[in-house]
Amino acid sequence: MSAAKSFPLVPQLPHSAAAVRHLVEAALPALGLALTGAQLDALFAYLDLISKWTRVYNLTAVRDPVEMVTHHLLDCLAALAPLAVHLEAARQLERAGPVLTPGLHAGQGSRLLDVGSGAGLPGVVIAICFPDVSVTCVDTVAKKAAFIKQVALTLKLPNLIGLHARVEALAAPGTAPFDVICSRAFASLADFTQWSSGALAPAGVWMAMKGKRPDDEMAALSQDIDVFHVEQLNVPALDAERCIVWMRKRAGLAG
């Protein structure tokens, strides 16, 4: 992933910072990623902000620096290569004809919504690694939305927006829809898709990050929803099952 802009220097991290950074750098090839030094600095600056805010606002239950990397950062980074594949495929379709993909925005990059974003996982990670993607992190908790705004300001991320709202409110007339709506350990697939359906572009997709393959949740989905792929993820240094459930509205029902 490339980025033309520069990020602020990474702040002072705990004594294990060098080892923790090496853990991330060593994991990148297995994740199919090639991040710049500036992007890595931004990711660790972001983790530092989470740590500072968590002391007051309890953004996350994970506080150990190594666990922050394995359970949060690497977990989110594991979703980036699959997301990149989807975005590139969507852009190829867009070049073939805008009628095929009316939800994509030519020349503006894709629009991604992270629902129930909390501390910004995975939304902030996506914004750092994909500077051409406009990322909106929405949460019903004001302090969490305020944190995302602070991250965008501190790390100078013009493609990152923090929004205090219910996701249902984003379906209002005149509101631009999203090409990808993602969530991570947020809600059941049925609730996730129902609540955010109005914000999804006609050719958009849902990207639900889950642990074990949620067969019961998939069986409970509305008939209007098509699960077109369940993608298994391998997260380095994390001995746990992870997957992405990719969904879309069935043909003839979008819009």
Report residues per predicted region.
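S-adenosylmethionine
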Residues: F130-A254
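Conserved SAM-binding loop of SAM-dependent methyltransferases across substrates and taxa
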Residues: A119-D132
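Class I SAM-dependent transferase core
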Residues: S2-G107, K143-K144, Q150-P158
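Conserved class I S-adenosyl-L-methionine
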Residues: V99, G107-G118
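Hydrophobic alpha-helical segments of small multi-pass membrane proteins
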Residues: D114-S117, L121, T140-K143
